[in-house]
Amino acid sequence: RSSAASDVYKRQGETLIASIVALALIVGLVRFVGWRVQVDEAVASQEQLQTQYDFNPGNIISDGLFFNGNALSEQQVNAIIEKQGAACSGEKCLKSMTFSTESQPANEYCEAYEGEPNESAAAIIYKSGKACDISQKVLLTVLQKEQHLLTATDPSDFQFKSAMGLSCPDDANCDPEYAGFFKQVYGAAKRYQYYVQHEDRYGYHAGTLNYIQYNPDASCGGSNVYIENKATALLYIYTPYQPNAAALDAGVGEGDACSTYGNRNFAIIYNSMFGSPRG
């Protein structure tokens, strides 16, 4: 009797385990199907935005166009600065300013940068992009997005000190450690590579759904975005908001009280100078 009872208990235990495993598989499958539905909905919405506004919040710029330290030569960078800044005639024009730069040793993010006493903006942009394998087109775009330095006719000291918006969050003061044109440009290029290698430390990831707000004020809302690549993920780490409908409807203008423009303007500026950021 004891052996028979033991067999019964054993069979009951095996049945219970099998039921638990089956239930876990069903729950996992339901969750996966639900996740796929959310992904499909997000991607469909993103494709609609791309068709309507030429802006895709999940694919702001391709990895191939972002991570390319050979995108432009120093001469090509200089030509763009000269063209964009044609209306500037003051002493502080980006095209005529020079900056003392400090040598930077090679590290896990960038190759070595050799500093010089009087480097042009074009040289700094070219060398920073080359050292850190970040497109010079991207660096030029961010300069214009953050402080309008390419087209400014009378730029202020602050515009140069915070040229790339590096360590200048929307809701706090800028970090003086990164103040200055060279520290901003080289620092931003290096920071981009840091973000890529340490994406797990931040709240935006490629290949999955990410809830992205429209504004620092959470009450303005946001939406799920399926981020398609690393370059787009790091843009959100750098500027953690997406444009709302009012911002997209406004084109290059202003939307409503909940609108933010950083990533919208990145796409618009890049496209105006270099063509589609998605390749």
Placement of each model-derived feature along the sequence:
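N-terminal export signals and maturation junctions of secreted/periplasmic proteins
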Residues: 17, 32-122
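Mobile, glycine-rich extracellular loop/lid and propeptide segments
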Residues: 97, 110-111, 117-154, 158
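Hydrophobic membrane-insertion alpha-helices, especially the h-region
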Residues: 15-32
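Soluble non-cytosolic domains of exported or imported proteins
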Residues: 71, 115-123, 129, 133-137, ...
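Short, small-residue-biased leader/transition segments that mark boundaries at the very start
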Residues: 2-9
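Catalytic and binding regions of secreted/periplasmic enzymes and modules that target cell-wall glycans
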Residues: 139-278
